[in-house]
Amino acid sequence: MSQTDILYACVSYKGVCLVEHKIANGNFIDLARRLITKIPPTSKKIYTSENHNFHYISENDLAFLCLCHEKLGVQIPSEFLSDIRQQFIRSYGQSFSQNSPTATYDPFIRVLEERMKYYSNPKSNKMNLVMDQVSEAKGALTDAIEKTIHRGEKIEIIVDKTERLQSESFVFKSNSVALKRKLWWQNKKLAIAIGLVVCILIAVITLALLKYFKVI
């Protein structure tokens, strides 16, 4: 038994112990059983006794408690309690009866034993910390890559729109030049036609006047 061991863990409902596991004997078991009768329906606290800490969390009268040396700190016991809480609710739900047979929850003793060993192993704790840091860094990197790709897609959309506008502008300019030339030629032909009509009218009027004055 070392100072990194979780010595005792239990799950209780309304002050009644449903399941527990220990790796050592001592008066701490009686102390833990008295303590669970005083845990508020919803709470999170640390109770200290002779260099050891009782850590507990409770919600809706369902409490999870563990005992360990004070040198183990706060983070690891807190993670342990959150872990067994999730597994217990996953296994048994959130509705309980104080009259349920004690044996109902006996299979969870193996879960407590396994998780106590896991969180009591310093190497596992350090590995968990490293893995969490790696996972966090990986998540941040993934988010950064996704944002970069998203920005890249926006840039590509802007470039495509710019190229399309340039193309449309060129087509519009070409069409404008062609239309201008067409209108110029139509105006030219109209001017020529008007000129011819005017010349013909002048010729007709001139001939009429000459005949009137009997010049011809």
From Swiss-Prot:
It is a single-pass type IV membrane protein. InterPro entries: Longin-like_dom_sf (IPR011012), Longin_dom (IPR010908), Synaptobrevin-like (IPR001388), Synaptobrevin-like_transport (IPR051097), V_SNARE_CC (IPR042855). PANTHER family: SNARE PROTEINS, VESICLE-ASSOCIATED MEMBRANE PROTEIN 7A. The keyword Endoplasmic reticulum applies. The lineage of its organism: Eukaryota, Amoebozoa, Evosea, Eumycetozoa, Dictyostelia. Keywords: Coiled coil, Cytoplasmic vesicle, Endoplasmic reticulum, Endosome, Golgi apparatus, Lysosome, Membrane, Protein transport, Signal-anchor, Transmembrane, Transmembrane helix, Transport. Pfam families: Longin, Synaptobrevin. Residues 126-186 form the v-SNARE coiled-coil homology domain. Signal peptide: none annotated. Residues 211-216 are vesicular. GO terms for cellular component: endocytic vesicle membrane; endoplasmic reticulum membrane; endosome; Golgi apparatus; late endosome membrane; lysosomal membrane; phagocytic vesicle; phagocytic vesicle membrane. Gene3D superfamilies: 1.20.5.110, Longin domain. GO terms for biological process: endosome to lysosome transport; protein transport; vesicle fusion; vesicle-mediated transport. This is Vesicle-associated membrane protein 7A. The chain crosses the membrane at residues 190-210. Component of the SNARE complex composed of syn7A, syn8A, vamp7A and vti1A.
